[in-house]
């Protein structure tokens, strides 16, 4: 299983400015994270579309429109990945999932609202454990996502 140290090593290898922030209380939901930091929270949610994983990256306060995802990726069935699937596919637990540094390449969809945030704006996202968040500039995160080799769909409004 992967954790905050694996995420930290992944980012250090890419020579990126970031911080893995540790909390006393868990930050497993975007609401619990928002209660502990000032700033923009994004979340990474793994879906299964016709048995293939799709990672959706969106603002913490927003919800996924499953029908939009289904149409975008041209599949019949879309569902949330089960906890076991999240761990098997990404290497991380639900509630700790970062948008990067996964066990395998995962097709990704980014919320269009995320692309509208200033490049140097600080965002917080899953930090690899239930007690850590990744603090990073939005532009740096999107650059890493672009270099990941993951298939990406155009940004959509969730």
Residue locations for each model-derived region?
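Extended, low-hydrophobicity, polar/charged segments
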Residues: 1-158
């Amino acid at each position: 299983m992967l954790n905050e140290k694996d995420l930290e090593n992944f980012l250090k290898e890419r020579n990126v400015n970031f911080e893995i922030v540790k909390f006393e209380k868990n930050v497993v939901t975007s609401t619990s994270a928002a209660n502990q930091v000032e700033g923009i929270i994004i979340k990474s949610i793994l879906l299964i579309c016709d048995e293939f994983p799709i990672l959706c990256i969106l603002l913490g306060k927003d919800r996924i429109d499953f029908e939009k995802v289904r149409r975008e990726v041209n599949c019949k069935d879309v569902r949330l990945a089960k906890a076991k699937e999240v761990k098997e596919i990404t290497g991380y637990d639900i509630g700790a999932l970062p948008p990067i540094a996964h066990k395998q390449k995962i097709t990704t969809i980014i919320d269009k609202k995320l692309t509208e945030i200033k490049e140097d704006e600080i965002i917080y996202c899953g930090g690899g454990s239930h007690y850590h968040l990744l603090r990073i500039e939005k532009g740096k995160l999107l650059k890493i996502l672009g270099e990941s080799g993951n298939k990406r769909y155009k940004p959509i409004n969730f």
